[in-house]
Amino acid sequence: WYHPLPFFNLQLLSKRNLSFSLITLGGVLLIMVSLVNITSGYLAAIQGYRQEQTSDLMLWVALPQLITLPIVAIICNTPRVDCRWVLAISLLLMATACVLAAQLTPEWNGDTFRVIALLQAVAQPMAIIPLLMQATGGLLPTDGPFAAAWFNAVKGFAATAAGGAIALLSRQRGDYHAGTIADGFGSAYSRASGSAEQLAQLAARQGHVLASADLYLLVAGLALLLTALILVMPTRIYPPRSVAA
């Protein structure tokens, strides 16, 4: 705790805004990575998309940010704008994107996800910039390297955790839904040649769709939980070189 030059300065966690930013950063990265993994997994398993086809959809998330990123920076640099509410709007947009995606059916393809991708393109800069402002607003210049260490650690952990959690939950929920669907078939088709195998494939396919919907709703719940955290934890900060009204 009293080490003169620690790699992780635990005392910085006593700053509410920094602690909030680290928690929310981890949550936001979980949401972002999860949305990519769920969507790409669905398109690969149900529509047979290859990686380059999924990458085309990801461009709908990345390229619009070349426009939205500077706009959000200008907005957050306005003293009258409370960046906490910019962050709240961002999380609500992410939750909306997840709820829309949870309505997916086996007929959905990459084109169907474009509106959802555009919502992400707007929401992501609206989350990252306010989080950086909240984290750095009350720090001294000498605290910068220690804060960077915390941010990098959270980023690495969140990305790894999201990938592992989505893979595990997708398999568990997929098996559960596939088993439930298969039980509903009964034995009426068991006498037909090849029917059992066909029904198993159909159950697995529909089970993956339902599992993807479950995961989208779970991620939406995380976004709403982080939105509620904004109401109780962070304090307002102002842009650099601005005077509070």
Residue spans of the language-model regions?
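Short amphipathic alpha-helical surface micro-motifs
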Residues: Y2, T68-P70, E197-A200
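Hydrophobic transmembrane architecture of multi-pass small-molecule transporters
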Residues: L132, G138, W150-A245
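Flexible cytoplasmic inter-helical loops of multi-pass small-molecule transporters
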Residues: Y2-F7, S242-A244
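12-transmembrane solute porter fold
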Residues: L5-D175
